[in-house]
């Protein structure tokens, strides 16, 4: 695939949705012979912006209306990221007036700061620096309750395809022809059977070409900010009879470096696949076995996606599958877009060519069907993995050299720190993801399964992420901490940091004797006067009479808490699972402001809450 600095596709992605849609757009442009630059916003070289004429951005939002981490991720030797360059105050207001741009935001209206990520980019790039819009910014909503798909009942993919259609329509009308060998010819779409070869792919290394690396010892190169930790404690803190396994997980730096972190900061953990799953994948693609342990290198440089967390050495197919390839994830559209042409092995088909054609057609349908219902029913509903898809479609014979193009890269996972500043151990509180699907198959989260398997003394790769959630001016302000379940994790760090002498902690779980995590410590803090503790148990009425959820306790304490918020500038910190809980807490908080805060109506109460969010006095960290 050729690249050009004139047309640029950038993405900011936290969970992979924006990356996947940007990949599809890039794929479509290449098939129409539009050379372009394609990378994350953080990987884009600011110096190239003066050569850019058409800028297409797809970006999600994370945390408190923040841009995804790969927008600010600084890699290589560049002194600044593209975004940090754009934020410089001395830039002229017409800096980007040579650019025509189109933006797509992906968001979830259940979060207070819906699509703030793309709005920040739009405000700076278009409003303040003069870029021209090809068409109005599109905003997709996971809930279909706001944005461009409001009230349609359609998912975010419907907004993406509207965006793609507009982008292609513009480019094809602007450039209906292209030059080939000095001749002007009509622009036509590439034959769908042709695979788009990536700029850099794998090949057998000339060095040690006849060797096989069978040792399990590996190292990771190319990421200077990567750290190594040693596991000190990994114990279950929910009862054995409870369905949810929650771990107290402690580790320390192997070089005994004292880590510097604050309440609200997170740890980035780099997981890997199991050896059993890697063997399963190789058994499915049995033609890989012969070279699975031979040394490999790249034809043209290491892809940027592999630099975060370091590249495994020795670099073999087996090690890449274990440490970098996320083949146990649910496949996205771009996976099918790239692999359907490899359904070629008729020798495995009981019905011969007819069955092969059926498999090819179905895979292609998953790649191109815009309503995506079949893809959702086949992959998302049963949480079917890429490996299971390959085990279903046995005609697919994948070329190993493109493995890092069609398989997604394992993304690191982020966990809130539970320990207090200065603790030599970094402590996490981790809910192990394990459940059964409609297929009655057990599913496990790749990172929590990795953590659950770790033994004391084993090593992990990690980084620290400073989020600066709790501001210095909040020191000694009253704090209301609300955290059901493992939402308690970052709140523990707040209490341990002793940044306030007036803390109310509202904790919720199902049962007092099953999943009341850190019960002894919380009650000890209560006895010593460090916190006012209010615990609710949703399935245990005997121990929680009249109070089922954290929002019930919030309402019961409404007058007292509202007084602290309105008259004493208290900070409200909400943590836990996204979905109904944060919405219900927010609605309860608004009702409290109306009843006890002297706000006459809903609008004035909401306005006050917005001001709290703006000044970071109402903090919502949900996942």
From Swiss-Prot:
Reaction catalysis annotation: 2 oxidized [2Fe-2S]-[protein] + NADPH = 2 reduced [2Fe-2S]-[protein] + NADP(+) + H(+)
Chain residues that bind NADP(+): 538-539
Complex and partners: Interacts with DRE2; as part of the cytosolic iron-sulfur (Fe-S) protein assembly (CIA) machinery.
Requisite cofactors: FAD; FMN
Name of the protein in its database record: NADPH-dependent diflavin oxidoreductase 1
Database matches in PANTHER family: NADPH-DEPENDENT DIFLAVIN OXIDOREDUCTASE 1 (PTHR19384:SF10), NITRIC OXIDE SYNTHASE-RELATED (PTHR19384)
Organism: Saccharomyces cerevisiae (strain ATCC 204508 / S288c) (Baker's yeast)
Major location category of this protein: cytoplasm
Sequence ranges assigned to domain Flavodoxin-like in this UniProt record: 7-168
EC numbers: 1.18.1.-
